[in-house]
């Protein structure tokens, strides 16, 4: 079934330039846009940007969670089984940041046990994703080949 974004609460984890561009698009689609960042500031694209320390409580009210944060010692494995357990079972996790931010085994378990509605994954702990990964066969997972940044505008700027 389809996942309608209009009217949903979208959480951007990592509110830098990439996260803010995502927020701009979600806002245009009629979403309530929240943010979580290591260094929260005010930004008109977000209803509010929260500190990382309150991430679990913000996950519990979010319908879609998009990860756009850098990989640091603080963010490595941030989305482990414990963190994923705070998400709604109707929520979608989107990872376009770094694969190691998400514990793939914990995510696979959450998806197979229907603790999450689905996931969109552009990055993985180890790339390319192993051919024997169960993620390939899950109907509630969309996998892209680490190219979420690709667009006609980017392409024309890189290859004039």
What residue ranges belong to the model's regions?
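Rossmann-like adenosine-cofactor binding region
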Residues: 40-134
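Residues at the starts of beta-strands that form the adenosine-phosphate
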Residues: 9, 31-32
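Conserved acidic E/D residue at the C-terminus of a beta-strand in Rossmann-like folds
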Residues: 37
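Oxidoreductase and adenylate-handling cofactor-binding alpha/beta cores
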Residues: 27-31, 160
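Phosphate-binding beta-alpha-beta segment of Rossmann-like dinucleotide-binding domains, i.e.
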Residues: 1-9, 21
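C-terminal helix-to-coil terminal segments
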Residues: 1, 127-160
């Amino acid at each position: 079934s389809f996942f309608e974004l209009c009217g949903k609460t979208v959480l951007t984890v990592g509110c830098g330039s990439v996260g803010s561009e995502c927020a701009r698009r979600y806002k245009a689609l009629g979403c309530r846009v929240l943010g979580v960042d290591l260094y929260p500031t005010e930004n008109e694209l977000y209803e509010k940007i929260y500190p990382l320390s309150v991430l679990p409580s913000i996950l519990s009210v979010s319908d879609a969670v998009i990860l756009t944060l850098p990989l640091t010692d603080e963010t490595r494995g941030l989305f482990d089984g414990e963190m994923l357990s705070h998400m709604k079972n109707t929520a979608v996790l989107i990872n376009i940041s770094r694969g190691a931010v998400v514990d793939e085994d914990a995510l696979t378990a959450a998806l197979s046990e229907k603790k999450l509605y689905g996931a969109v994954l552009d990055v993985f702990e180890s790339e390319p994703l192993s051919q024997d990964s169960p993620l390939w066969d899950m109907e509630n997972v969309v996998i892209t080949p680490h190219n979420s940044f690709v667009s006609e505008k980017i392409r024309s700027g890189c290859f004039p």
